[in-house]
Amino acid sequence: MKGSYYDKFVSESIDTIKNKISQRTFENTVDNGCYTDLSLSRKRLGFVLQNNVEEMDKNLANFDNKWQPSNGKKYWFTNYEDLLRQLRTLIWEKDIKTYYIDNQNSYLWTEIGLLSFLKKEKTKESVDFSNIQFFEANKIFSDSGSFLIFGNQNTINKLNNNSINVFVAGIEQVMKNTDDIELYLKISKDRYKEKNDKLYPIIYTPSSKNNDILFILDNMRSNVMNFIPQRSALACLHCGLCSDVCPVFCNAGDKAYDNIFSGPIASVLLPHLENIADYTFVSYACTLCGNCEKVCPISLPLRDMITENRHYIMEKGLLPFSEKNKNRKMRKVLLSRKKLNKISFFKRIKFKRLLSKSLRKNRKIPKMEKYSFNQQYIKNLKEKFNQI
């Protein structure tokens, strides 16, 4: 085949990446006039959100203490199955026939499978009037017990009718107070601007008079908190910019992830949200190019987190035996100056043994130089010394 398949694969991959990778960056999608120093604003917001994640336990405890019976009912769930079970009980008790879901494209509804669940319960969607309404709480504030919702005039009208209002929030969405909410709203507004210009922030304080119910969902977020370097990824805004510029995601798509998280943020979180042994490949698929860090609105150090994932996977021995054996042999070669300085013929043989047949089937092993860089450097030094 003389590398024709390989050349075709490379050219198609390059075309795919060029066509799919967005040229947008965070800097050219915002109004720079809103910020005196955009880079500093991103870092500050990142620090605030990551600090809230670090203090999640304190903020949740404070929120629980601040909540009064007059605010309505509040439920805690470790997984979405328990949440849906409680929701089914509520539907049966109240004899609910119609529902309304605000912002149906939200990743949260996809995560808990709300739409498919309501269809199974034989309830019908109603825009004009519904027995129960669902809203995503983008942030919950521990000092006041209020929520932040992105909505429009229709959302406000829905909140004030006589239906049962169900608010759903992940534990990672808790914030200490509203001191830095202005900066968060500016950057979040810019992120949602292209999707829907009519959305604007609403801070809502729940009340039992309005039949308000709050569902707080863990769903393995607390498991991520056990990993100190990776826990700050829970501050993610879910803007999708990192996926837009990721060469792996643009070439392979999101089918490999099979989750609401995809792209670089999935390479960090998925191994800890799911069974880590089944998702080791997502951390190793990353090329560590750094495009995601450049466009992240809150400057998350995604490359460092992915590297920490790989280190943890290696320490726990979660790689298949064949991969571990190859890594061990490669490590021996790369850490030995003598082996690296061997003539190219023997290096080529070793590479053939280390690389599987599937990789060598349609791809040529690059030709090795006769001398290593170290040998050439010493040789050049000797020549210069002799000339003197």
Task: List where the protein language model places each region.
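Short, contiguous, pocket-lining structural segments
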Residues: 173, 234-238
